[in-house]
Amino acid sequence: MTVLVSLSGISKNFSGVQALKGVDFDLRAGEVHALVGENGAGKSTLMRVLAGEMKPTSGTVSIHGETMQHSGPRGAAGRGISVIHQELALAPDLTVAENIFLGRLPRIVNHRRLRKAASEILERLGFDIDPAIHAGRLTVAHQQVVEIAKALSNRARIIVFDEPTAVLANTDAERLLAIIRELRAGGTGAVYISHRLNEVFDLSDRITVMKDGSHVETLETSATDVDAVIARMVGRQMSALFPSKAGRVPGEVVVRVRNVSRGRKVRDVSFSVRAGEVVGLGGLVGSGRTEVARLVFGADKMDSGTVELNGKPLHLSSPREAVRARIGLVPEDRKQQGVILDAPIRINTTLAKIRSISRLGFLDAGKERQVAVALGAEMRLKASSVDAPVSSLSGGNQQKVALAKWFHADCDLLILDEPTRGVDVGAKGEIYNLINDLAKAGKAILVISSEHQELFGICDRVLVMAEGAIVGELTESKFTEQQLLTLAMTRSARERDETSQ
């Protein structure tokens, strides 16, 4: 197989700090090579060297067997290298077509030809996106597609995907992964950076693990497993990330959901969660788990059924009422719904219970800071100060801020929807400890996760959903991925058969 890229002995120093230490890496034509490691491992820095965004302190970059001199991003693009960053770089006020060909537009633009060329590339990717609309009006998923179209228009044969699914819903993420598979089949070489190890194993041919700026090992994906990769990333296996459940004693029922329905999304769902208990909601994408969470939180209105909190019926018409009832929700899309990115940490952490830091209707800034500092210490938050905007934090620390908000609110029931999505492995372990501490303190916790090991590692029970209904319950003695998938997939297949008859 042809080697497209060879990085040899790449080192990079920043003011005496060695970010990369003699790293070797290569990429072949028609493969997806995953690059994994904790935040700060050096993954993005290495790819910025490849993309010409940084000049290495030492080492060589070879493209198609030819050693290249550093010539900046434009030079790298000219050699067929493109990077799809997590933070997208489209010009929102330009059209889709203009974005795709940006930097290569003639002085006099024939917009009809431009739109036609853009449409042809988008159709190759399987998306019907109007090339004439402004990029700022697109969903995040469609913006990702336009970024890929831009790379293809530049005849890129080497594409780096840096956390491409971090802000995407599951269905959009699946479509993006399908595009990457098609690119691979056409001979493109792709570097895939992600904390989502399930995606890494589903997509990649090889996996390179980095730690503290060094190359640890490159593995054939088919010859390794998640535990082996995690052990190389953090020095311990996945199972070691989960805290002991000893000391968690389930008490009285905190929340009881009875026969709740909403259209075909949620159908006759009933369950309960006790104080000091962590209950999981598992199932396939689209099974109705998030919809159940939104109904319990008052974000959506149920067609029928009841929710009781501490033995009393709840009649929630909004999330505001849920917060007053001491119910909290950390949503799956933390950047859009869980935190205010541009606001400082101190505002985000106290937002759900702002009355507790107010006096006579006025905010007590000193108390706000005091609470935020205390929460930051409890959460082991890594930030320069509580005045720093949440947008400046890593994914794991952003998630800690989202959790801190509900720690401060002192909820009786906390719903966590994909609590470690887009979070590195080390931060996952810290979040699992926080969840465990809440349970030990007597809080009722409902966890939704697409990572089965996560559900089994932190939950006392797992309810399995399919086609909007709860189809089974797994206790610890039956915690296996096979059991969960058998319940989820058998019911899903049966429902589809019944619908088609």
Curated annotation (Swiss-Prot):
Keywords: ATP-binding, Cell inner membrane, Cell membrane, Membrane, Nucleotide-binding, Repeat, Sugar transport, Translocase, Transport. ATP binds at G37, E38, N39, G40, A41, G42, K43, S44. PROSITE patterns: ABC_TRANSPORTER_1, ABC_TRANSPORTER_2, MGLA, RBSA. Coiled coil: none annotated. It catalyses: D-ribose(out) + ATP + H2O = D-ribose(in) + ADP + phosphate + H(+); D-galactose(out) + ATP + H2O = D-galactose(in) + ADP + phosphate + H(+). It is found in: Cell inner membrane. CDD domains: ABC_Carb_Monos_I (cd03216), ABC_Carb_Monos_II (cd03215). GO terms for cellular component: plasma membrane. SMART domains: AAA (SM00382). InterPro entries: AAA+_ATPase, ABC_carbohydrate_import_ATPase, ABC_transporter-like_ATP-bd, ABC_transporter-like_CS, P-loop_NTPase. Transmembrane segments: none annotated. Its EC number is 7.5.2.11, 7.5.2.7. It is a peripheral membrane protein. Residues 5-237, 249-492 form the ABC transporter domain. The keyword Electron transport does not apply. The keyword Membrane applies. GO terms for molecular function: ABC-type D-ribose transporter activity; ATP binding; ATP hydrolysis activity. Belongs to the ABC transporter superfamily. Carbohydrate importer 2 (CUT2) (TC 3.A.1.2) family. Part of an ABC transporter complex involved in carbohydrate import. Could be involved in ribose, galactose and/or methyl galactoside import. Responsible for energy coupling to the transport system. This is Putative ribose/galactose/methyl galactoside import ATP-binding protein 1.
